[in-house]
From Swiss-Prot:
Keyword Transcription regulation applies: no
Keyword check for Metal-binding: no
Task performed by this protein: Forms pores that allow passive diffusion of small molecules across the outer membrane.
Complex and partners: Homotrimer.
Gene Ontology process terms (BP): monoatomic ion transport
Topology of the protein relative to the lipid bilayer: Multi-pass membrane protein
GO terms for MF: porin activity
Record's protein name: Outer membrane protein U
Keyword annotations of the record: Cell outer membrane, Ion transport, Membrane, Porin, Signal, Transmembrane, Transmembrane beta strand, Transport
Coiled coil segments of this chain: none
Pfam family, any one: Porin_4
Length: 341
């Protein structure tokens, strides 16, 4: 693939991965390795293997996972390329048995076309608000509990998505189609053999976002909006990067269901020192006029190699145990090892 197309692909990826916090953002994925490249066609393979031990109230749980992804690109001409991407996540929690109930989550499955004016894809992909929550979602394990995204703004299937980078301005937009259902004369979902007509589930919606980088000042701002059925929300975010220091804040407001108001805000800070990185976040949210999230988390990450790290993360749960259940108000300690490939 020629240099023009590579530059286009890199700039588009920067919009999607929150590159403005590179080196401090511990939650993102690393770029994969090119395993094939010839005659304008390339294939990258990437992912992670992550061992995660969670401790709450002295009780342990295995939250380990493996992600594997494939990114294929084909040059059509000097300003146009085709792209396909798949990522799956495998998790296991056997509860001390040789169980067969492990799960595979198809996180991404999409294909599309890109060029000078951005990239358009269809399939299971991110909505437009993920790049806004990336401002404060910078920790190795905890964080991002107060900026809840409605389904159409998150990672979902049956979605037509666009992303583009125009100088210092990055934009994203997505539209999710309602899912077709076969129904009988009474409107009940049935097999197509017994159906009288087609209907849909009413889960269509859209999301929009934009991020602007103020040159080399280290200052970035972002805004986004999403709407789906009886749900809607908007988000505003800002960040400042000064060498090895990073600060960010996010505010969100909307309705998670009809007459169910939701308001949240997140604050994040990070510091990189040699091969170590330290991050902290505060999250607070209110759902239906009741506090649904209130926590402070801090973690430390050490890179033995660029693709191998260890981390320890602790979340102080500030929810009142008299108003929330004992389980919902517990603190959490997490210890992890992560290998990126």
């Amino acid at each position: 693939m020629n240099k023009t197309l590579i530059a286009l692909a890199v700039s588009a990826a920067a919009v999607a991965t929150g590159a403005y916090a590179d080196g401090i953002n511990q939650s993102g994925d690393k770029a994969g390795s090119t395993v094939y490249s010839a005659k304008g066609t390339s294939l990258e393979v990437g992912g992670r293997a992550e061992a995660r031990l969670s401790l709450k109230d002295g009780k342990a749980q295995d939250n380990s996972r493996v992600r594997l992804n494939f990114l294929g690109k084909a040059e059509i001409n000097d300003s146009l390329y085709g792209v396909g991407f798949y990522e799956g996540e495998f998790t296991t929690n056997d509860q001390g048995k040789n169980a067969s109930n492990n799960s595979l989550d198809n996180r991404y499955t999409y294909a599309g076309i890109g060029g000078t004016y951005g990239e358009v894809t269809y399939g299971k992909n991110d909505g437009a608000l993920g790049v806004i929550t990336d401002f404060t979602d910078i920790m190795s394990y905890h964080g991002n509990t107060a900026a809840e995204k409605i389904a159409v703004a998150d990672r979902v299937d049956n979605m037509l998505a666009y992303k583009g980078q125009f100088g210092d301005l990055g934009v994203k937009a997505s539209y999710r189609f309602a899912d077709r259902n076969a129904v009988d004369a009474m409107g009940n979902v049935v097999t197509e053999t017994n159906a009288a007509k087609y209907s849909d589930n009413g889960e269509d919606g859209y999301s929009l976002s934009a991020i602007y980088t103020f040159g080399d000042t280290g200052f970035n701002v972002g805004a986004g909006y999403a709407d789906q059925d009886d749900q809607n929300e908007y988000m505003l975010a800002a960040s400042y990067r000064m060498e090895n220091l990073y600060f960010a804040g996010l505010f969100t407001d909307g309705e998670l269901a009809k007459d169910v108001d939701y308001t949240g805000y997140e604050l994040a800070a990070g510091y990189k020192l040699g091969q170590a990185a330290f991050t902290a976040t505060y999250n607070n949210a209110e759902t239906a006029k009741k506090t649904s999230a209130d926590n402070f988390a801090i973690d430390a990450t050490y890179y033995f190699k660029p693709n191998f790290r260890s981390y320890i993360s602790y979340q102080f749960n500030l929810l009142d145990s008299d108003k929330a259940s004992k389980v919902a108000s517990e603190d959490e300690l997490a210890i992890g090892l992560r290998y990126d490939f």
